[in-house]
Amino acid sequence: MSPSDSCIVMNPSQGLAQPVPHARPKAGRFVETPTVKWLRQAFAVLHATSPAAAAHLAYVLLTRPPRVPERPWQASLRERAAQDALPFGRGQLALYGWGSGPTVLLVHGWGARGTHLGKMVPPLVAAGYRVVAFDAPGHGHSSGRSATLPQFASAIAAVAAHVGEIHTLVAHSFGVAMALWAQLDWGLRARRQVLFSSLDHCKWVTEEFARLMQLPEAVLARGRQLMVERSQGAMDWERLA
């Protein structure tokens, strides 16, 4: 599986519009680094001595988003926002708002932050929209160091319920899958949607991780199963297709 190479503009009342082609995104986080080489060796040792421990490590890494440094322009945009902290689970979500008018909700991808789509904020505000962004669980300034898929999806719905009617939902990459799941299972509603650089299937992320770490299929399968078991029934890989 791979990321999609198109953008879909969606109006729930009118169905899907035609995909808008754009450059195919690169899986930039699935690259060779010294840390990756070390982890690959660790997985090899664990698989030989304790496959269960190898699967647990896979689960931990698959639910721990990478910490990407905040860029200066993102920090500046965040500092100019009306900021809020929304209670969520055992922690809180960091919320950011700019402007006034119909609400546009921005949903970032895995390992990003609320201001990742911040270049959209000034033109949207100038056009008379209120723009809301947030850091997903375990991302940016929100609580936690890890995030399960159900936490990510339900957080989108929680933010939407908090800020009120969503005129347009804009989601990127992994955030697209989570936003669609939030609509299926957590009651998220938006009049319009702009979804771009999505995944064909959420399993793609785990497949790329396994390829990078050279994981045996059994370890990957058990790691995925742990994600299901620890979601207390909220996870269903086929439903996320």
Regions found by a protein language model. Give the residues of each.
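Active-site glycine-rich loops that stabilize anionic/oxyanionic intermediates
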Residues: 101, 109-112
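An N-terminal hydrophobic leader/cap segment in hydrolases
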Residues: 4-5, 29-85
